[in-house]
């Protein structure tokens, strides 16, 4: 269930793709977000502990619909599904036949999403900077919480390759690093009506804020 504790990080991507706050400051981000309403692609993720050891690897597909809909589906090594429908965030684990659910507003309030879409909060809570040198062939935009913010991370970085979002790197408050590489982006696909919905089956054990 490590991914469930990190799903809020994906709201970084949703917030960045919403555009108005950060896009004007960074040419790559501006080009990537221009005219964007929906997005679909593939991801591979590694969680690395403070000793540099890989604790978790996963890969799958991600779908976004601005401003706040998300489908994050792990295909390997284990099936797992996260759906944010605008009101709730669902995590479904088919192996356990269990679904956990949280109110999306509560999670967003405790995540950088609210700051990224609110310029006043962004300036108050975070230092946003562009890394001077390229790293791994990418141009990087970095966020770091200021002062006593309640953010659940130490730093976040977004790597761009030729105006495409290629990577996210996040360091949590325990010093663990999550690295997510993206590929195969499709811009503005038309999604089926149930893409961002989750309805638990009758025999699914549901835990949380229904």
Curated annotation (Swiss-Prot):
Its main location: periplasm. InterPro entries: LolA/LolB/LppX, OM_lipoprot_carrier_LolA-like, OM_lipoprot_carrier_LolA_Pbac. CDD domains: LolA. It is found in: Periplasm. Keywords: Chaperone, Periplasm, Protein transport, Signal, Transport. Residues 1-23 form the signal peptide. It holds the Pfam family LolA. One of its GO terms (biological process) is lipoprotein localization to outer membrane. One of its GO terms (cellular component) is outer membrane-bounded periplasmic space. Monomer. Belongs to the LolA family. Participates in the translocation of lipoproteins from the inner membrane to the outer membrane. Only forms a complex with a lipoprotein if the residue after the N-terminal Cys is not an aspartate (The Asp acts as a targeting signal to indicate that the lipoprotein should stay in the inner membrane). This is Outer-membrane lipoprotein carrier protein. The lineage of its organism: Bacteria, Pseudomonadati, Pseudomonadota, Gammaproteobacteria, Lysobacterales.
């Amino acid at each position: 269930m490590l991914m469930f504790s990190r799903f809020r990080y994906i709201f970084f991507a949703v917030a960045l793709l919403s555009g108005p706050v950060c896009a004007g400051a960074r040419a790559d981000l501006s080009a990537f977000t221009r005219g964007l309403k929906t997005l679909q692609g593939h991801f591979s993720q590694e969680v690395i502990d403070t000793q540099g050891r890989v604790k978790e690897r996963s890969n799958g597909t991600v779908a976004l619909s601005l401003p706040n809909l998300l489908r994050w589906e792990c295909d390997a090594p284990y099936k797992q599904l996260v759906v944010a429908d605008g009101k709730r965030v669902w995590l479904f684990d088919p192996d356990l036949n269990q679904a956990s659910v949280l109110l999306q507003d509560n999670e967003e309030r405790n995540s950088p999403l609210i700051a990224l879409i609110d310029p006043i909060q962004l300036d108050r809570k975070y230092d946003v900077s562009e890394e001077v040198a390229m790293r791994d062939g990418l141009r990087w935009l970095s966020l770091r919480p200021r002062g006593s913010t309640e953010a659940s991370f130490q730093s976040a970085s977004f790597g761009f390759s030729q105006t495409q979002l290629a990577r996210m790197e996040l360091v949590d408050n325990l010093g663990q690093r999550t690295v997510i590489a993206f590929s195969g982006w499709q811009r503005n696909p038309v999604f089926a009506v149930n893409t961002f919905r989750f309805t638990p089956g009758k025999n699914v054990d549901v835990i949380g804020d229904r």
